[in-house]
Amino acid sequence: MTSIWFALLGFLWTVYLAGSSSVLDPSELQPNFIHRRLHSQEKREMQKEILSILGLNHRPRPHLNNGKYNSAPLFMLDLYNSMSTEEKSDVDQYRSLFTTTRPTLASLEFLHDADMVMSFVNLVENDRELSPQRRHYREYKFNLSQIPEGEAITAAEFRIYKECVTRASRNETFLLSVFQVVGEHPDRDVDLFLLESRRLWAAEEGWLEFDITALSNLWVTSPLHNLGLQISVETSSGWSINPKEAGLVGRYGALERQPFMVAFFKVSEVRVRTGRSVGKRRQTNRNRSNIRTLGDYNSDQKTACRKHELYVSFRELGWQDWIIAPEGYAANYCDGECSFPLNAHMNATNHAIVQTLVHLMNPQNVPKPCCAPTKLHAISVLYYDDNSNVILKKYKNMVVRACGCH
């Protein structure tokens, strides 16, 4: 009996090798592009699932400046557009119409190692009343409370823009000092700790970056220590002046040049499904008869296992107010038969080949192999949180690039 079994396997293997050399008709390789308007129930289900994949428990509702971008999202847009072309081929690349903030080489290096980047807007709206000695000091505060627990900051920068001072001599210099606020008092000025001082030329123009990595980690681990920053500017003669006189742009300056903070994070892989979505899986399955699946739109003519096109539009989901980029991405999906013989283009595993042969002899007990992704790629999503901070996050295994029989 054993010899007959192996003889049959040998015969089927020979037939498989002969069939694998055949070439598909080119029409079979044409993508099946699915695009239709979602029904309300489908839309809600898709919104829940995608929010779960993005690691969000609700839809962010940021407070925006009449649709205008300030410096923080523009900087993040530049980071987003600096992603690899391989990754961006699966998404709609966002082209900014504004003058952007030009990330430094150091920022791009941080981006390469980071899984998430967050920018933070300055929360100070009105200058507090300071003593005459510090009347020209300016303060900045950033809310780091929304950072997920357990995520470490690998790099952080305070960025402030300096314009050319035309009314001053080109050789004139200013001393810019950045301080950490370490203590507050009701009856006197705050206690300051000098982080860095830098000599600036009057004719100098561009973004100034200050490393606050250690300080940011302190703020995350000990929120009570997050009392913000202060800056001061002195002339070469030692006189304290308004930072604006040295060309430093404050919160009343152009939106695209306002100061902000950016932090780079190394995070663990996002859980594909949260407890919420697992708990509702049974309910979703009970309602499945009322929702047409992708297979329903592609089951009339079953073809061999291959990749099919599927585009997810964030705009169609009504998320264009909080997702900056991309407008959508080509998620794609795998569908088709893994029937004998398995052609070479099916990317079948050795196990799938054997399973197919055994299925032919015992179809009741051994199922056919499944058509599943063999290559998945990441995408990056740029979005606002509830505090109008901008987050750039990489999400793994979001795009199907190849399919095969498993």
Model-found features: residue ranges?
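Secreted, disulfide-rich extracellular signaling modules
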Residues: 2-406
